[in-house]
From Swiss-Prot:
Interacts with get3. Its main location: endoplasmic reticulum. This is Protein get1. Signal peptide: none annotated. It is a multi-pass membrane protein. The gene is get1. Required for the post-translational delivery of tail-anchored (TA) proteins to the endoplasmic reticulum. Acts as a membrane receptor for soluble get3, which recognizes and selectively binds the transmembrane domain of TA proteins in the cytosol. Disulfide bonds: none annotated.
């Protein structure tokens, strides 16, 4: 019974982690990577963003009617910075997709890998017994796949069933 609850809680944890926590941790992991990687793409992206915001602030403080020459110069500078920033933004987004995929893959391997190891090591152990006469022989055989004795529910079948119940209910 303890093993049955352990497997159910493991599947519940993996489902809740994937649904609610994983995206947040992937984004935070990317932010940490971007801050401490020392990559010139991220540095120039942040520098351009700060220059763009500073120029936009200056542009908003200047009246277009009273100081047209200054406003036009700032507007041209803002447009040039905006074009550079958009180009740099595409580069950073491509790099961020790669880093986020790597972090997501790591989380997937850790969560699914642990479940796979538990399932593999306990593949011959039954989770619980099905009462005699409740199901036909072919159904008992199917529930015992891959290695449990006929008449018992295997770890693989229990994991599959608990995953489906959890994903349906949550």
């Amino acid at each position: 019974m303890d093993f049955l609850l352990f497997l159910f809680c493991l599947n519940l944890f993996i489902h809740l982690f994937d649904k609610y926590v994983k995206t947040f941790l992937v984004n935070q992991g990317f932010r940490v990577y971007a801050r401490f990687s020392g990559s010139p793409e991220f540095k120039s992206y942040n520098d351009l963003r700060l220059q763009l915001l500073s120029t936009k602030r200056d542009l908003n403080n200047v009246s277009a009617q009273d100081e047209f020459a200054k406003w036009a110069r700032l507007n041209r500078k803002f447009d040039q910075l905006n074009v550079k920033w958009e180009k740099q933004s595409k580069i950073v987004s491509q790099k961020s997709e790669g880093v986020k995929k790597l972090i997501s893959l790591t989380f997937w391997i850790v969560t699914r890998g642990y479940r796979f190891i538990v399932q593999f090591k306990n593949s011959g152990n039954p989770v619980f017994a099905v009462p005699e006469g409740m199901l036909p022989t072919w159904a008992l055989w199917f529930l015992a796949l891959p290695k449990a004795k006929t008449g018992y529910v295997s770890v693989a079948v229990w994991n599959f069933a608990s995953q489906k119940v959890i994903s349906t209910l949550l």
